[in-house]
């Protein structure tokens, strides 16, 4: 039986399939759209990807995404540098910034084993409150305890974001850990 596959198309499908949350069928649809229906948009995407990979780096202070040595948040003199929000990923910074509720600065720590203690001490200079914005898990609770222990000699107030019942979700669809934390952190009305 003869193979009628087009190698360049298969390579494009494989490239799309390597992205998070993109399965084979979606990759085929994206590849087809790119090469057969909107070549200009595909070239624009290719250029944006190449530019992003070549230009975006980690901020030297907080590890956020940046085009310069310091990200736009660390270099903003109007941010409240007394409040430091520690997150697991630069993607988390994007999410928090979209909420418009936090005006402090950030620090990204993905795992304890990746943490540079000297760099962390540099990042917390002048900080009066550290807010941990981690998803709830035993691993993140352990990381919080570890960081608190390392910084205990400093006069810093430690908090973490509230966790509990999301808006619009039925109680039967909530995991037990989230429901337990919501009950523990209940507020007076």
PLM feature segments, named:
Residues 27, 76-137:
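Extended interfacial segments that mediate partner engagement and assembly in macromolecular machines
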Residues 19, 37, 52, 65, ...:
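Conserved, well-folded catalytic cores of nucleic-acid-processing
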Residues 1-20:
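Extended, structured, electrostatic nucleic-acid-contact surfaces
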Residues 121-189:
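Long C-terminal interaction/binding lobes of large macromolecular proteins
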Residues 47-93:
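Cys/His-rich short segments
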Residues 8-14, 37-57:
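Short Cys/His-rich Zn2+-coordinating modules
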């Amino acid at each position: 039986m003869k193979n009628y596959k087009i190698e360049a198309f298969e390579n494009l499908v494989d490239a799309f399939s390597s992205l998070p949350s993109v399965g084979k069928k979606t990759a085929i649809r994206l590849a087809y759209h790119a090469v057969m229906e909107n070549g200009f948009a595909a070239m624009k995407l290719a250029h944006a990807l190449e530019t992003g990979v070549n230009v975006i780096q980690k901020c030297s202070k907080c590890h956020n995404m940046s085009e310069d040595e310091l990200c736009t948040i660390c270099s903003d003199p109007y941010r409240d540098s007394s409040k430091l929000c520690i997150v697991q990923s630069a993607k988390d910074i994007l999410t928090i910034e979209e909420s418009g509720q936090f005006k402090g600065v950030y620090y990204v720590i993905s795992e304890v084993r990746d943490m540079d203690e000297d760099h962390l001490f540099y990042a917390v200079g002048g900080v009066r409150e550290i807010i941990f914005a981690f998803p709830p898990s035993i691993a993140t609770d352990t990381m919080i305890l570890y960081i608190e222990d390392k910084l205990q000699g400093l006069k810093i107030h430690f908090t973490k974001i509230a966790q509990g019942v999301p808006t619009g979700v039925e109680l039967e669809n909530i995991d037990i850990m989230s429901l337990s934390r919501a009950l523990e952190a209940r507020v007076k009305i």
